[in-house]
From Swiss-Prot:
Its EC number is 3.1.4.46. PANTHER family: GLYCEROPHOSPHODIESTER PHOSPHODIESTERASE GDPDL6-RELATED, GLYCEROPHOSPHORYL DIESTER PHOSPHODIESTERASE. InterPro entries: GP_PDE_dom, PLC-like_Pdiesterase_TIM-brl. Residues 707-729 are annotated as: Disordered. The keyword Signal applies. The gene is GDPDL6. It is a single-pass membrane protein. GO terms for cellular component: membrane. It catalyses: a sn-glycero-3-phosphodiester + H2O = an alcohol + sn-glycerol 3-phosphate + H(+). Keywords: Glycerol metabolism, Glycoprotein, Hydrolase, Membrane, Signal, Transmembrane, Transmembrane helix. The chain crosses the membrane at residues 731-751. Residues 1-17 form the signal peptide. This is Glycerophosphodiester phosphodiesterase GDPDL6. It is found in: Membrane.
């Protein structure tokens, strides 16, 4: 246990945001809030940091205190043992959150609770000594880490109060049930004299009325909790929807209400937001505060939020029309940063850091990649660099698309499946390739959002699945100039194959397009030329303003001097995989490499790719929050740019004052310390050691010279020189694809279990 506390304190000290002194807070300009009292909305941590550790465990409570904004509130769901001891657990049944069913496998019972028969292991059947000494906690949401299961004891209410959170909220869900079994939550509270309890909530009107005078003397706020609109409130036997019609009556026994978040922003069957209800306005008019519950980073919620949990909080606290007075969350640091750092953020604020926000096929998390809509949204979202991976049609038109194979990212399968072919130089599976179709044929199909997580059931913005138009390279460059973006990135793929086998000179086409756009004759906008082929980059050496970026598409663990010297001959920057900077195993960050430092010593910039918002793509160490991942790579690893499919998330972070760790402020978004979270788990639960990534071999940087563009017959199927030798960037394609498939299968098992 001592080891646990030492390691955990180190984890807190090194990797999470600790609130600073109130004096620093005074320097921050006051924000105008649309809450009932005009104050900042409260962050209420349900069971501490229950999104990571078992609910109300000492770890969950300590981490919530260490990562939340000053003045946050700790929420404990009160349950009572048969000898009257108060515990902090969300359910009256113990089997979903503890090991009780394995300790007493034959002790399942059935009780009637609020008119319904429930089966399980009920807390009222066990005394406190049994629960504290024989039962341990488990994570009750299966997509969350199970590595801490069975290691932490159930917390008594007094244990949580002993952590001295800034504020404490006690939720009493089952007063009527406990009273039936001769246990009184009201008497339990009186025994505590309400000390340290700032807020008490309950869905039972009778209970709130019974403690009203005591709570008033203790200056404890009472909150009435609404359940499902069709559920029945035990005291009045009225549906909650009926009680909602007379909010003014609630003011007689409570100062606020707690509602599921869809009472405020309902979501339709397609998972898009419906117009906001008038609930907050009506409650505020009645003099009631409004708290919204149900927030978590690892829930699939409205597509309007683009899998960015901060966007959801902002919808409730900074929509220009109203603000809730507080949010109940399993991930308090995300709520804290959303309210403290991102609310009332002027869209024109300058970035706090030097890192570039570079798109991956535009805003391809929201629209089909490389379409006009994806690029426009990326520009609107504040991206610095928009990107175009250049593909070629059979008749020589250069256009922007993620890959030469159109199968996954267009509707080509419905029309051109008979044109599918095998091109082992590009990929190990058959595909419908752009260079086998004319531009007119390509334009006859629709773009399609490419979803890297289809196997796990995740979707991306299905309402716009096929929206937008394909973008030619010329149109892309004109868009970049017209919108005055910081720069453009041109990614050149398969140049050797296209030249030798298809008679298409993609390098020459790109050079010509840049010349025609005059981007080769100015220094106002950046031009980045990216390729996994060093010979392609060398062909642009004669244009000094261009930044040449070598894409290294395999995991590396080190960058030896010989490899770096070879990179310097061809490139000014590298594009590296996330796992080349921070190693990950089973969704835990296990360590970090020195690759960024090694590249920077040689004056080589480092861009990291690809960042996505979906929580299944984000290590637990980042709190299932894309913002923490951004902070880890930008502030923690010092990268020079992030390549992302959701540029709005990256831009919001970089424009927030909380991203500047040199400022003295009340809250900062700090990077995670890779590997620290795993040390909290017991030794027996540790992950098996994984071998380090191999170092970058200089041979993998060197490519043969580009072959000349072959003169082929007009049908594009004859002629051409012999097969070219394999390029460095394609050496590991087959292996990487196999690993990707295995990883996808593993994710599917992990997140559908």
């Amino acid at each position: 246990m001592l080891r646990f506390f030492i390691l955990f304190s180190l984890f807190l000290h090194s990797s999470v945001a600790a609130p600073k002194t109130p004096a620093a807070a005074a320097a921050v300009p006051a924000k105008k809030w649309l809450t009932l009292n005009g104050q900042e909305p409260a962050v209420v941590a349900r069971g501490g940091f229950s999104g990571l550790f078992p609910e109300s465990s000492i770890s969950a409570n300590d981490l919530a205190i260490g990562t939340s904004s000053p003045g946050f509130t700790m929420l404990c769901n009160l349950q009572m043992t048969k000898d009257g001891v108060g515990l902090c657990l969300s359910d009256i049944r113990l089997d979903n959150a503890t090991t009780i069913s394995s300790v007493f496998p034959k002790a399942q019972k059935t009780y009637k609770v609020n008119g319904q028969d429930l089966k399980g292991w009920f807390v009222i059947d066990y005394d406190a000594d049994t629960i504290f000494n024989k039962v341990t906690l488990v994570q009750n949401i299966f997509s969350r880490p199970s590595i801490f299961d069975g290691q932490m004891s159930v917390s008594a209410v007094e244990d949580v109060l002993g952590t001295k959170p800034p504020k404490f909220w006690l939720s009493v869900q089952y007063d009527a049930f406990y009273m039936e079994h001769k246990l009184s939550p009201a008497e339990y509270l009186r025994s505590l004299r309400f000390r340290g309890i700032n807020v008490i909530s309950s869905p039972e009107i009778g209970f709130l009325k019974s403690i009203g005078m005591d709570a008033g003397r203790a200056k404890t706020k009472l909150i009435f909790e609404f359940k499902d609109p069709e559920a029945v409130e035990p005291t009045t036997n009225k549906k909650y929807s009926e009680i909602q019609q007379n909010l003014a009556a609630i003011k007689a026994f409570a100062s606020g209400v707690l509602v599921p978040k869809d009472y405020i922003w309902p979501i339709d069957s397609a998972k898009y937001l419906k117009p906001a209800t008038t609930f907050v306005a009506d409650a505020h008019k009645a003099g009631l505060e409004v708290y919204a519950s149900g927030f978590a980073n690892d829930l699939r919620t409205s597509f309007n939020y683009s899998y960015d949990p901060s966007a959801e909080y902002l919808q409730f606290v900074d929509n220009g029309q109203f603000s809730v007075d507080g949010v109940i969350t399993d991930f308090p640091p995300t709520a804290s940063q959303s309210i403290t750092c991102f609310s009332h953020q002027n869209g024109n604020l300058p970035k706090a850091g030097h890192a570039l926000v570079i798109t991956h096929n535009g805003a391809s998390g929201d629209y089909p990649g490389c379409t006009d809509l994806a690029y426009q949204k990326a520009i609107d979202d504040g991206a610095d660099i928009i990107d175009c991976s250049v593909q070629m049609s059979k008749d020589g038109i250069a256009f922007c698309h993620d890959a030469a194979d159109l199968s996954a990212s267009t509707t080509a399968r419905t029309t051109f499946m008979s044109r599918a072919t095998s091109v082992p130089e590009i990929q190990p599976t058959n595909g419908i390739f752009s260079f086998d179709l004319t531009w007119a044929e390509i334009q006859s199909v629709k773009p399609q959002i490419e979803n890297p997580f289809t196997a796990t059931g995740f979707q991306r913005n299905p309402a716009n699945k096929n929206a937008g138009k394909f973008t030619t390279l010329a149109d892309f460059l004109e868009l970049g100039k017209a919108k005055a973006v910081t720069g453009v990135l041109i990614n050149i793929q398969n140049a050797a194959y296209l030249a030798s086998k298809k008679g298409l000179g993609v390098v020459d086409v790109v050079k010509s397009a840049l010349t025609n756009s005059t981007l080769d004759k100015q220094s106002t906008q950046k031009v980045l030329i990216q390729s996994d082929d060093s010979s392609v980059l060398s062909s642009f050496e004669a244009v000094p303003p261009y930044t040449r970026v070598l894409s290294i598409d395999k995991e590396i663990g080190d960058a030896p001097k010989t490899s770096i010297e070879e990179i310097k001959k061809h490139a000014d920057a590298v594009n590296l995989l996330r796992t080349s900077l921070i190693t990950v195993s089973q969704s835990f960050a296990t360590g970090k490499t020195n690759v960024v430092e090694e590249m920077h010593k040689a004056n080589i910039s480092v861009y990291v790719s690809v960042l996505r918002n979906e929580y299944i793509a984000i290590a637990f160490d980042y709190f299932s929050d894309p913002t923490i991942e951004l902070a880890t790579f930008i502030a923690g690893r010092g990268v020079d740019g992030v390549i992302t499919e959701f540029p709005a998330t990256a831009t919001r972070y970089l424009r927030s004052p909380c991203s500047d760790l040199n400022k003295d402020q009340p809250y900062a978004i700090l990077p995670a310390d890779a590997g620290a979270l795993l040390t909290v788990a017991d030794k027996e639960a540790q992950l098996p050691a994984i071998p380090p990534n191999p170092p970058l071999d200089a041979k993998d940087v060197i490519d043969p010279p580009l072959p000349p563009v072959a003169k082929l017959a007009s049908n594009g199927t004859e002629g051409g020189p012999p097969q070219t030798p394999p390029r460095s960037g394609t050496v590991a394609i087959a292996a990487n694809l196999s690993l990707s498939l295995l990883a996808m299968m593993a994710l599917g098992l992990l997140y559908t279990a």
